[in-house]
Amino acid sequence: LLRRKSHDHAQNHDGDKCLRGASLGYYQSFLNQYKPQCILNKP
């Protein structure tokens, strides 16, 4: 569920880093690293 949501969010943005992090499965690391642009920028 989390990976799907992050992947969907990444598609809605121009975020290669978001998509890469989610697709690799390093959800926690990608969350901590890209939280400002992947999570806080959520429309």
From Swiss-Prot:
| Domain of life the protein comes from | Eukaryota
Quote the subcellular location field of this record: Secreted
- Quick one: which residues bind Zn(2+)? H13
Listed GO CC annotations: extracellular region; host extracellular space
EC number of this enzyme: 3.4.24.-
What is the enzyme's main class?
A: hydrolase
Post-translational modification note? This protein autoproteolytically degrades to 10 kDa and 14 kDa fragments in the presence of SDS. Interestingly, the two fragments, as well as reduced crotalin are able to bind vWF, indicating that the binding activity does not require a specific protein conformation.
- Keyword Zinc in record: yes
Q: Which keywords describe this protein according to UniProt?
A: Disulfide bond, Fibrinogenolytic toxin, Hemorrhagic toxin, Hemostasis impairing toxin, Hydrolase, Metal-binding, Metalloprotease, Platelet aggregation inhibiting toxin, Protease, Secreted, Toxin, Zinc
Q: In which tissues is it expressed?
A: Expressed by the venom gland.
| BP term (GO), one | proteolysis
Q: Which GO terms describe its molecular function?
A: metal ion binding; metalloendopeptidase activity; toxin activity
Keyword Ribosomal protein among UniProt keywords:
no
Q: Which residues form the Peptidase M12B domain?
A: 1-43
Cofactor dependence: Zn(2+)
**Details of cofactor binding:** Binds 1 zinc ion per subunit.
Which miscellaneous remark does the UniProt record hold? Negative results: does not induce thrombocytopenia after injection into mice.
Q: What does this protein do?
A: Snake venom zinc metalloproteinase that inhibits ristocin-induced platelet aggregation by abolishing the binding of von Willebrand factor (vWF) to platelet glycoprotein Ib alpha (GPIBA) through the cleavage of both GP1BA and vWF. Also has fibrinogenolytic activities by degrading the alpha- (FGA) and beta-chain (FGB) of fibrinogen. In vivo, induces a slight hemorrhage when applied to chick chorioallantoic membrane and has potent antithrombic effect.
Q: What's the family?
A: Belongs to the venom metalloproteinase (M12B) family. P-I subfamily.
Q: How does it assemble?
A: Monomer.
Q: By what name is this protein known? A: Snake venom metalloproteinase crotalin
Species of provenance: Crotalus atrox
Lineage at the top is:
Eukaryota, Metazoa, Chordata, Craniata, Vertebrata
